[in-house]
From Swiss-Prot:
Described function: Binds directly to 23S ribosomal RNA and is necessary for the in vitro assembly process of the 50S ribosomal subunit. It is not involved in the protein synthesizing functions of that subunit.
Organism: Desulfotalea psychrophila (strain LSv54 / DSM 12343)
Protein name: Large ribosomal subunit protein bL20
GO cellular component: ribonucleoprotein complex; ribosome
Signal sequence annotation: none
Xref: InterPro entries: Ribosomal_bL20, RIBOSOMAL_L20_CS, Ribosomal_protein_bL20_C
Alphabetized GO MF terms: rRNA binding; structural constituent of ribosome
GO biological process: ribosomal large subunit assembly; translation
Family: Belongs to the bacterial ribosomal protein bL20 family.
Length: 118
């Protein structure tokens, strides 16, 4: 049987991995074995952190809303509950932007939330 080196396909596979490892330090960007390990780990982290990013932003928005609500003498849970009772359906991202960038509008919303809770 003739010896098969898998030339083109193997080279293409290795080059694909090394291309993904471009910019890594040291042997991780040059040696196929270490590059494979580094790329596999990086892809796992990327997948995990795409999910984590959504949770992180939600936490950030809630923190900002809570800070804005406390400046208006109402806590976060009563603020959100009051908005729900008043029928105002703004998501946390929009509310956080209002709390940071448009304080008068956020104050009006907190007044509405207080009235709905009363």
């Amino acid at each position: 049987m003739p010896r098969v080196t898998r030339g083109f396909k193997a080279r293409r596979r290795r080059n694909r991995v090394l291309k993904l490892a471009k910019g890594y330090r040291g042997a991780r960007s040059r040696l196929f074995k270490t590059a494979t390990e580094a790329v596999d780990r990086a892809l796992c982290y990327a997948y995990r952190d795409r999910k984590q990013r959504k949770r992180d932003f939600r936490r950030l928005w809630i923190t900002r809303i809570n800070a804005g609500a406390k400046m208006n003498d109402i806590n976060y849970s009563r603020f959100i509950g009051g908005l729900a009772k008043a029928g105002i359906e703004l998501d946390r991202k929009v509310l956080a932007n209002l709390a940071v960038l448009d304080a008068p509008a956020f104050t009006k919303l907190s007044v509405i939330a207080k009235e709905a809770n009363a």
